[in-house]
């Protein structure tokens, strides 16, 4: 009997040997697709794989990953609760910033990941993930820790853990934003009937939410 794959598995398979952009020829070891709970209500999206991620084939396994694990725990979450992916699926050489053509090539696959997982809440880590999902050139320090109801999910931008490791003054704001994240999750969680645990039951964004539209208009007006 032929093996049946889920849409997420099909997408991962289609990208296994991806050569759609120049990153495939610039020293990457492998495509780093994503990892976690395929039915997660909460998804985290970073920028791109680093050295350790490229070696192991999973997002956030280096120092930034260890910090992320601590932050998740502070918000009452674990890796098994969430799904983690990056905008860019291949490591840029020397960990440089992604280039626009690379983002444009990879973005459709990120959006397909999000559609397959169907999270209610997406936490974007850093500038690139936030700008890609908001589709606006806006700095993460301006929007971090805020709620953006989009068409299919709620976006919650956060500072990137790697930035906090390189700039120690960002660590406390990052921890504070994870406290806000926990408060938001707690507000929108409901107890499971079979046990004393809680399950995240975040509401879908409301069409025509004028408060969120006004927030975005204020942010992006120039």
Outline where the language-model segments fall.
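A polyanion-binding, active-site-adjacent surface
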Residues: 1-190, 200-203, 211-222
């Amino acid at each position: 009997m032929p093996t049946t794959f889920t849409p997420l598995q099909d997408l991962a398979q289609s990208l296994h040997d991806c050569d759609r952009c120049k990153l495939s020829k610039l020293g990457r070891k492998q495509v780093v697709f994503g990892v976690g709970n395929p039915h997660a209500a909460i998804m985290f999206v970073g920028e791109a794989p680093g050295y350790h991620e490229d070696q192991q084939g999973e997002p956030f396994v280096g120092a930034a990953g260890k910090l992320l694990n601590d932050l998740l725990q502070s918000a009452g979450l674990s890796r098994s609760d969430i799904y983690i992916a990056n905008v860019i699926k291949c490591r840029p050489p020397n960990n440089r910033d992604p280039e626009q053509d690379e983002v444009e090539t990879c973005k459709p696959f990120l959006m397909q990941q999000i559609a397959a997982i169907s999270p209610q809440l997406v936490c974007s880590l850093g500038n690139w993930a936030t700008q890609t999902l908001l589709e606006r050139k806006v700095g993460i320090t301006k929007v971090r820790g805020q709620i953006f109801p989009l068409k299919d999910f709620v976006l919650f931008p956060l500072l990137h853990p790697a930035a906090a490791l390189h700039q120690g003054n960002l660590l406390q704001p990052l921890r504070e934003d994870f406290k806000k994240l926990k408060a938001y999750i707690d507000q929108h969680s409901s107890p499971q009937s079979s046990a004393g645990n809680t399950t995240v039951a975040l509401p879908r964004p409301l069409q025509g939410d004028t408060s969120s539209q006004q927030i975005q208009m204020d942010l992006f007006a120039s």
